[in-house]
Amino acid sequence: MLKSKDSSKDGDGRSSSGTVTLKCKDLRVIQLEIPDMEETFNVARSVQALSSLENISLRYPFFYRPAGCKLGKGWPRHTMENFYHNLKAETDAWRLSDVNNNFKVCPSYPEKVIVPVSCSDTTLKRAAAFRQGRRFPVLSYYHPRNKMVLLRSSQPLVGPNHHCCEDDEMLLDAALMGQWRGFIIDTRTEQEAKQARSAGGGTENKNRYPKWSVFHRPLERGQALQSSLTRVVGACYETYLGRNHWLSKLQASQWLSHIKEALSTAGLAAECIEREGTCVLVHGEEGTNNTLLVTSLAQLILSPDCRTVVGFQDLIEREWLQAGHPFQVRCARSGWAHGRFQQESPNFLLFLDCCWQLTRQFPMAMEFNEKFLCTLATHAYSSEYGTFLCNSEKERYVYKIRENTHSLWGALNNFQQRKYLVNPVYERNALAIWPSVAPQSIELWEGFFLRYFVPTKHKEMSWQRTWELSGSYHRPGYK
C-alpha cells in the first residue's frame, strides 16, 4: 500500500526529508515528497492505520455527506421482488420464499429467494443442511423462450462416506419441471472435487441424481487469481520494458487466460439453456465467487434486459451483492495486495473485464459504456458509497448500511452522471450474444489497467462526437 524512503541526508547522517509512495486501490501511484523525516513517518503511519480499518462503521461512506443529496436515494432496490414479478408473468411454477427471513437458514443468502412452488420451506431447510454454508439451490435466471432455468448453490456435503439428502434431490428434480435431464457445471477440476469430498464436500453422485450430468469446468480462484491480477498490474506499471518483454510478462500473468475460461464457461451454461434446452446448476465450493461469475455472465449473454444500465445494476444487486459475494474481504487491496491478505480475490473485477470484452465484440448490444464499467470497478475497491460495503446482506442489515450511507446506484442514475455512462450507439438486441474466446478476440482492458498512462483526450472527443451524431441526447430517457 505504501513505503517511505530518504531523499537526502544532513552532514550528521540524519535523514532530512523523505518520500511516501501510495499505491492506491484504483491503481494510481502517488508520491509525496515531505521535507521533514519525522513528518514523513507520521504520514506513513496515519495512512497505514486509515487504510486498514477493521470497524466497518468507521469507513468513509458513513461520513460522506454530499451537498443536496438525501440519505435513502437509491435505497432500497427491490431487485428480487421485481425479478419475481416479471417471472410470475411467465410461469407459476416458482415462488418467492421467505424461508430465510432474518437470515436464519443461510447467512449469506438474501431474506427472499426463488424456489420451485412444489418445494416446502421444510424441504428447503433440510436441503440447506446438505450444502456448504447452507447455500441450497435457488433460481438465478428463467429463460422465457424455452422455460429452462439457471440455478446456483454451493457444493453438496457428500463427504468420504457418500452422504445423501433426499430433500436436496427432490429440490433439484423439482427444478427440472418434468425435463428428463439437466447439467451441473462444477467450477473445479475433477481432482479438486474429489479432494473436497475427503474434507466433507464433493459433487453430486450420479446414482443419487440420475437426471443430472456433471461437467467440470475449472476456473482459477483465491490466491492464484489474485496473484494473476498482481502480475498484470505489475506489468502495466513497468513502462520501461520493451514491447516483446512487456507482452511476455502480460502472457505470463495469465489474466487474459482467466477471461477466456470465464467467458467459455458462461457460454457453455448459456448454450445448454438456449440451444440444448436443458436446465443448469452452477456451483464450486462456497458458491460465492466463481459460481456468481458464471451465472451473471450467462445472463448477460442470454438476456437483453441485463444489458441495459438499470438491468445491469439489478444483475449486480441480485447475483453479486444479494447473492453473498464477500466484497469486504475479496476487494480489500486490489492489484497491490500481497500474501498477507489471504482472502483477496478479484472475481468481481474479472466479471467486469469479461463484460468489457463483450462490449468490444458487440459494440451496440450494451446500453452502458466502458466508463460505467471502470466506475464500478473503482467503487468495488474504494468508494464513498455504501453499496459494496460488507460481505453479505445480513452484514449490511446489521451495520444499517441503507440508513447510514449513500447508494452508488442513486448517484449513477442521476442524469448529470448517467449521460456519461451510456453507449450512444446502443440498440436493443433480443438475441443471445455469443462471445468469441479466440486469442485475437481477448484483449487487455487498457481503459482500466492503463488509464493513468494512456491519454484519454482523443477518446473523450470521439465519444462526444458520437453522441452528437447519434442524437442520443434526444432519445427517450435522456432528456
Could you say what each language-model-derived stretch is?
Residues 1-280, 296-479:
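Cys-dependent protein tyrosine phosphatase-like superfamily
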Residues 285-299:
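Glycine-rich nucleophile elbow surrounding the catalytic serine of serine-hydrolase chemistry
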